[in-house]
Every structure is written in structure tokens, then in C-alpha cells.
């Protein structure tokens, strides 16, 4: 995360995580954060409307209340309203990403981003999880699954600074480089 963005998001993320801990809502808040991040990423209309300076703060808060009042904890809804009041709701995704980073840091959870050519079924996810746990040297691991059809087949795993590239596109590229050296 960029330093300026980190300066904006960290106080909100730290404070909200502290509130969640005080109310014994951490697991619930983490799950809700992941769901909201997914919605934020999938619905550009929603995220753009919330970030728009044209839409009044009170209107944004009313929309947030209507959409989320039954879906998230009251403290989470208060965070959303606070971000709207402070004209920071456009940074919601960054605040939630930072909250998840802090959560993982506190619990020593490593994040592994797995990018595959197609969606992985549960058996494939479990197999990749075992492999990544042995490579990362920890059982405390969270998988972030992404799909990129450009990989053609296989997968790429990023854990911290380690990369496991078992994609077909990478193998084709390496084969092409090897053939270029031979000729």
C-alpha cells in the first residue's frame, strides 16, 4: 500500500479492529470485510457512487444504512457512516484491506494469493493449501483465490516474497526462451 494511503487508512483500520476486539466481533467483522471488499470490487457503480463528491453525505449514509443495516454489525455500519462523514468512503476498500492486514499480522497468518486459469474446486484448494503450507513453513495460512484465463492452465502462488509458478503460460514462455537460445 502507498505510504500516503496507509497514513489515511491505518487509523481507521486500527480503531475498528480494536472496537471489534472489545465487542468480541473480530471473526464476524473479518468475514464481513471480505464480503464487502468483494462487493466493492464487483460493483464499480456502487464504489464510484460512494466515492463521488456529487452525492451528498447524508444520501450516502442513507444508502449504506438501507443496504447494510441487516448484513453487518452495528459497529461496522458506524465505520461506514464515519467514513462517509469524513469524506473517506472512497477509501473503504483500502481501509478494509488494511484491517485484514492488521488482523493477519496480529494472528501470524500468512496470505497466499493463488491465481489459477480456472476456478479451483475444494479438493484442488486443499491440495494447493497443503503444498503452500509446506513451502511457506506455516500451517497458519489464508488463501486468496483469483482466476486469470491468460495462464492457460496451472496456477501461480504468491506468499510474501516467494512465488511458485506452475502455470502453463510460464512453461510455454520458458520453452520458447530455451528454443531461442538453441537456434
From Swiss-Prot:
Compartments reported by the entry: Cellular thylakoid membrane
Topology in the lipid bilayer: Peripheral membrane protein
Single GO cellular component term: plasma membrane-derived thylakoid membrane
Pfam families: OSCP
Keywords: ATP synthesis, CF(1), Hydrogen ion transport, Ion transport, Membrane, Thylakoid, Transport
SUPFAM superfamilies according to UniProt: N-terminal domain of the delta subunit of the F1F0-ATP synthase
Family: Belongs to the ATPase delta chain family.
Entry-linked NCBIfam families: ATP_synt_delta
Function per UniProt: F(1)F(0) ATP synthase produces ATP from ADP in the presence of a proton or sodium gradient. F-type ATPases consist of two structural domains, F(1) containing the extramembraneous catalytic core and F(0) containing the membrane proton channel, linked together by a central stalk and a peripheral stalk. During catalysis, ATP synthesis in the catalytic domain of F(1) is coupled via a rotary mechanism of the central stalk subunits to proton translocation. This protein is part of the stalk that links CF(0) to CF(1). It either transmits conformational changes from CF(0) to CF(1) or is implicated in proton conduction.
The protein, known as: ATP synthase subunit delta
Source organism of the structure: Prochlorococcus marinus (strain SARG / CCMP1375 / SS120)
